[in-house]
Structures are given as C-alpha cells and as structure tokens.
Amino acid sequence: MFSSSVHGNGAQYLSITSGLLVEDAQGHRYVTCALHGFLSDGIVFHPDPIRGRPIGKVVQSFPNADVGLVRLEPGIRYTNEFFESKEGRVSGVTPRRFATSEMGDIIEMDNPFNGSCAGITVGRNYVLENDLYHRHHWQIFERGIKAEDRSCGSPNLDGNGEVAAIFRFADSENPKIGFALRGEDVEKLGLKLVDNHVF
C-alpha cells in the first residue's frame, strides 16, 4: 500500500495499491503507482503519513498513462507478489511478463481495498482526456464487490497469471465497470517486469 503526503493542514491523504516492480531500458528499478494519487512533492508513505514513514519518491512520470515510477529507499525489498485474499486464485502468483489480451479474456484483480474481484475484458477502446486519446481496456467485474477507488494501480492478471493491464479507474455511476491501461502499452513505455529487488 502506498500513500501520499498529507493534503494541506488537515489529516487527509490518498492511499492506493502499490504497483509492479519494473526495470527500464537503463536497468534502473522502480515500483509503478497510479500517478494521480500523489502530490507534487512525490513522497510515498507506507502504510500512511500519519502512522507510517516515507519509503520512497515518485521520480518519473508518464502523465498521459497515469503511471508514476517510485524509487524506494535503500534497503527496502520489493517482490512482485499479490495480495492474498481467500477468494482469489492469484495468491502467490509471480507474473513474469506483460500479456497481450483480447476481448472476452477473463481478468482478476486482488488488493487490500476490495479483495478479490474477477471480470471480463469487454472492449479495447480509447478514453479522451485533456484532448488526448488513451488506449484502455473496458472491464466488467462480475465476481466480488465493486472495484474501489483506491484500487488504482492494481495489476489485472489474465488466466495464465500474466499482467494483462493496470487498473486505472472505475466508472463513477457503475463501479462494476472499470478501465485499465493495457499491458502492452506499459511495455511501450520501455518497462519490463522484475521478480524482486533490494533497493
């Protein structure tokens, strides 16, 4: 779980799911995050800024994809393992690559905020934001509760345990409908998955 700094003088902050351990073309390693979850200072806390401590900083961003790259503090180990809810089938899965997925593919997402939920990719389309079109999967979650707001950044696994997409946001009127950044588009950012790493 990642959390932002406190907003203003109050005690408000945003928590999101920690993402995937990735490596860029230069061999630098980062953990992905949903970029919109962090203030301009880029400081990342775990579990939150009230009870926790700073564990890293957003050092690179791909704003058109809502993906940020977090460099964790030295000595912190990060492993690409998934949250283990009893209902899910992804417990203990370590994904090896980003997958190319198609309409009709079953996906599963499991995180501390909504537990396990599964659904189907119903389309590959574009979302218009800030006069730019972004490719997304449209997903309908059919098992489990709705995808909660703080699920942003959660990996969506396909039936082979590979990363089909990174969850981005749910429809405000129907939270069972979600949108996710396609795995192949994450690869086009020059990123590949890594099993584990000590920063």
Pin down the residues of each PLM region.
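C-terminal subregion of chymotrypsin/trypsin-like serine protease catalytic domains
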Residues: 146-148, 156-199
